[in-house]
A protein has these predicted regions:
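Outer-membrane beta-barrel "beta-signal"
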Residues: 180-186, 212-224
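Repeated loop/turn-to-beta-strand initiation elements of outer-membrane beta-barrel proteins
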Residues: 68-74, 112-117, 144-153, 185-193
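Sequence/structural signature of outer-membrane beta-barrel proteins
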Residues: 38-45, 77-88, 122-130, 156-167, ...
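Short glycine/proline- and aromatic-enriched beta-strand/turn motifs that initiate or cap beta-hairpins
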Residues: 19-82, 101, 215
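Cleavable N-terminal export/targeting peptides
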Residues: 1-28, 224
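Outer-membrane beta-barrel architecture
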Residues: 61, 104-106, 139-143, 177-181, ...
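Residues that define the transmembrane beta-barrel architecture of outer-membrane proteins
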Residues: 52-58, 97-103, 123-125, 132-138, ...
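Transmembrane beta-strands of outer-membrane beta-barrel proteins
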Residues: 29-36, 63, 73-77, 118-122, ...
């Protein structure tokens, strides 16, 4: 065995560790815009289902730190789907099924030099075909910074309702997302690749409807 190989391997590992050690803690002061490039949605009720392709969509999110650990954060999703069958809006050929807005206050805690866990509670407003529920929301996640790449894994859920005549409609969304932000130069905006897998569960009286959807996005993030 060539003795130089272990030496080079150890040197490479030490270099990687030193580069990782120099990485800064992830920032929670940022704004981000996402353009949703592809996705679909499936509406299911009583064993029947209908699928819809995404026509267009965008997302906004951001955060602002107050002190060392407390933060305010928010996110918004707006998604339009092809609706040639007129499932939602009659004569129009697109439908807004599952927009979502969340604004919360929380905190982040470092668990390693480059990794923070965070959580926030606040106001959530999901929609279904123009009907908006309002209630409380919760988001938890982890964010890790590795030199030129910042990865964020997050889970958002809510318990909301609204009135339709004398009936109460519950809209309970759950979203699981992954964002990977790539920095090409110091202090420059970052390229963000994102994926979201989600569901909206709707219930009115004894009737239930499930709305499952996922999408891929590309965006721009500016951290401060």
């Amino acid at each position: 065995m060539n003795k130089k190989i272990p030496v080079f391997a150890i040197a490479a590992l030490a270099g990687a560790i030193s580069q990782t050690a120099m990485a800064e803690a992830p920032s929670f002061n940022y704004v981000q815009f996402d353009y949703v490039v592809s996705g679909d949605s499936e509406v299911s009720e009583g064993g029947l289902s209908e699928s819809f392709d995404l026509e267009q969509g965008f997302g906004l999110q951001g955060g602002f730190e107050i002190g060392d650990y407390v933060m305010v954060m928010g996110r918004h999703l707006s998604l339009d789907y092809e609706d040639d069958l007129g499932f939602a809006l009659g004569d129009t050929d697109n439908a807004v099924f599952n927009d979502m807005t969340f604004i919360g206050v929380g905190a982040h805690i470092p668990v390693a030099d480059m990794i923070d866990l965070y959580g926030a509670v606040g106001f959530s407003r999901p929609t279904f075909i123009g009907i908006a529920g309002e209630g409380y929301g919760l988001e938890v996640g982890a964010r890790a910074n590795f030199e030129m790449v910042t990865a964020s894994l997050w889970y958002n859920m809510a318990d909301t309702d609204t009135k339709i005549g004398a009936d109460s409609l519950d809209i309970d969304p759950e979203l699981l997302g992954l964002d990977v932000a790539i920095s090409f130069a110091p202090d420059a905006p970052e390229l963000v690749l994102g994926y979201v897998d989600a569901t909206h569960e709707l219930e009115i009286d004894n009737d239930k409807l499930d709305l499952d959807y996922d999408h891929f996005s590309i965006g721009v993030r500016k951290s401060f």
